[in-house]
Design a protein with these regions (language model features):
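Repetitive helical segments and hydrophobic/amphipathic motifs
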Residues: 11-12
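A residue-level marker of the well-folded mature domains of exported/periplasmic proteins
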Residues: 2-7, 21-323
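C-terminal motif of bacterial Sec signal peptides marking the signal peptidase cleavage site
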Residues: 16-20
Length: 323
């Protein structure tokens, strides 16, 4: 499996860009991103097509989930003749993500595809972007502002599936009671909140105790520390709500040397697949970020061409990946 490449390029569209919001430009239009931004500021461009820049703003630039989402967006951009500028904070940070939105508007983005880290925090910036005529499309995690369309996993249903998979494994091992640890990202990210809600619903009336969730901010090292603490409490299972928390949980189970702790999580990465192959994680709920990225670009182009998408919410699906 190929190793993940962290994206840490700086945005070169405007001299006024501040630090904290990373970006990666991939030329899909004939001109460079810099000249496209300059021309966008000076002249009118077609609703969609050559010279049209769409900003893709994810929660961070590190998780393989976002890298794959960007790959899907870039492929669609090439097919549709637009430019997608990938912009993301170095880490999951509301202030940096807001900065990315403001930078995108200043750079002349006609549309913004966004995965909101904090739905409330980013909403004002998105409203200001809309007031400037920028089209908004959500992928993975929406904010609290009406958008052209949303493409995401049915996170509550997928979370319940994760819980059901853990229950089946516990039952097969003859475990009918015990404590379950839950590692989430934060209290605001809607997608992860829904995953936890769905996961907990699977255990209702099943005789297990789900411990109070702990927040690892999507960071694998922090999540591993949380998982290690859960393990010292004697948990029989640990659920990770995203890539970082799942990786951390698997690494903690591996480091503990203990058998019988069932680890279940979300997202697909080389690290997670390796932990599954080695038996430290039972399974992961693999989303389809490439589909989210591609559909997001397609929706932006349609909206810029005047089509009404009606704020439709589309489920991009999930698969259970096991050994």
């Amino acid at each position: 499996m190929k190793k993940m490449l962290a994206l840490a390029c700086s945005l070169g569209l405007a001299a006024s860009l501040m630090t904290g919001c990373n970006s990666k430009t991939e030329d899909v239009a004939a001109s460079t991103a810099a000249s496209a931004a300059t021309e966008a500021a000076k002249t009118e461009t077609p609703a969609a097509g050559s010279g049209t820049m769409i900003a893709l703003i994810t929660m961070d630039s590190i998780d393989q989930h976002w890298v794959t989402l960007n790959e899907g967006a870039q492929k669609a951009a090439g097919e549709l003749g637009v430019t997608v500028q990938f912009m993301a904070p170095n880490t999951k940070d509301d202030a940096q993500q807001i900065e990315c939105v403001n930078n995108a508007v200043s750079a002349g983005a006609k549309a913004i595809i966004v995965a909101a880290n904090g739905p409330d925090a980013i909403s004002s910036a998105l409203k200001e972007a809309q007031s400037s005529g920028v089209k908004i499309v959500y992928v993975d995690s929406p904010a609290n502002v009406d958008a052209e369309a949303t493409f995401s996993t049915d996170n509550k249903a997928a979370g319940k599936t994760a819980g059901e998979e853990m229950l089946k494994a516990l039952s097969a091992a003859g475990v009918t009671s015990g404590s379950i640890g839950v590692i989430n990202v934060n209290a605001a990210t809607d997608s992860c909140v829904m995953r936890e809600e769905g996961f907990r619903s699977a255990f209702e009336g099943k005789g297990f105790t789900l411990l109070e969730r702990q927040y690892g901010e999507g960071d694998a090292a922090k999540s591993q520390s949380i998982a290690e603490n859960y393990i010292t409490q004697g948990v029989v299972g640990i659920f990770g709500c995203n890539e970082g928390s799942t990786t951390g949980a698997g690494n903690a189970i591996k480091a503990s040397g203990k058998d019988g702790i069932i680890g279940v999580g979300f997202d697909k990465s080389d690290a997670i697949l390796g932990l599954i192959d080695d038996g430290y994680l039972l399974c992961t709920m693999a989303q389809n970020p490439d589909v989210m990225g591609a559909k997001g670009v397609e929706a932006c182009v349609k909206a810029l061409e005047g089509d009404s998408l009606g704020g439709a919410v589309s489920d991009t699906g999930v698969s259970v990946l096991k050994k």
